[in-house]
Amino acid sequence: MMKKQIINKKDLLGLGPNSKLIKDYKKQWTTLSKIQEETLIGNILGDVYIKKLKRNKHFLLQFEWKNKAYIEHIVRVFDEYVISPPTLYERKNHLGNKVITWRAQTFEHKAFDKLGYYFMENHKKIIKPDLVLNYITERSLAYWFMDDGGKWDYNKKTKNKSLVLHTQGFKKEEVEILINDLNIKFNLNCSIKFNKNKPIIYIPNKDYELFYNLVNPYIIPEMKYKLLFNV
């Protein structure tokens, strides 16, 4: 019996999406690994777009960050689904200032459909009541924080260890669900705050050590700056 040949990703460069070789390559993968799924849940709560283009049957992922090391790390996590390396992208913001980011994306694949259908409704991310209790792990929380977390107090001399998760893209009611269940599952004392009338999750100073210990094992070195104080 002949052993099935493994298709190398390098052989796909320059091929169109309808290439037989690409279609055969995709068939080698069926589902996300546990690490990939936990990572992606945090990414979707953050900055990653999971979308289905009109011509596609399945979902794909789109990544965009300023931090090159971080996008390179994420591309490695989803390596088998990403053909091309991150590319530099320049644009001007609403103030006319130049913004430089790095972009990458996966090809569309059925492995993303489970979370695509779970999170997306009418092309918009939604929060379901069982998300935190049934899906979010410490790893998910860490990637959510690396994507869309930061410090509360930007005073350089501050001793305030409070943190925030930026959830401005979600409804107030959805953020309240997230807060309630994060507090239950991880024994936190999060509360809701508002930034320009949009809801964000506030992690108080007294929770810093607990939160640090939850996420620190998964924070990559280039993103450690987000954890302001060592424990």
Swiss-Prot record:
Keyword Hydrolase carried by entry: yes
Enzyme class: hydrolase
Gene Ontology cellular-component terms listed: mitochondrion
Xref: Pfam families: LAGLIDADG_2 (PF03161)
GO biological process: Group II intron splicing; intron homing; mRNA cis splicing, via spliceosome
Keywords (A to Z) from UniProt: Endonuclease, Hydrolase, Intron homing, Mitochondrion, Nuclease
Transmembrane segments: none
Annotated InterPro entries: Chloro/Mito_RNA_Process, Homing_endonucl, LAGLIDADG_dom
The EC number(s) this enzyme carries: 3.1.-.-
Coiled coil stretches, renumbered: none
Top-level division of the source organism's lineage: Eukaryota
Any one GO molecular function term: endonuclease activity
Gene3D superfamilies: Homing endonucleases (3.10.28.10)
Compartments, record wording: Mitochondrion
Mitochondrion among keywords: yes
Record's function text: Endonuclease involved in mitochondrial 21S rRNA gene intron homing.
Family: Belongs to the LAGLIDADG endonuclease family.
Listed PANTHER family: PENTATRICOPEPTIDE REPEAT-CONTAINING PROTEIN OTP51, CHLOROPLASTIC
Identification of the protein by name: Probable intron-encoded endonuclease 1
Taxonomic classification: Eukaryota, Fungi, Dikarya, Ascomycota, Saccharomycotina
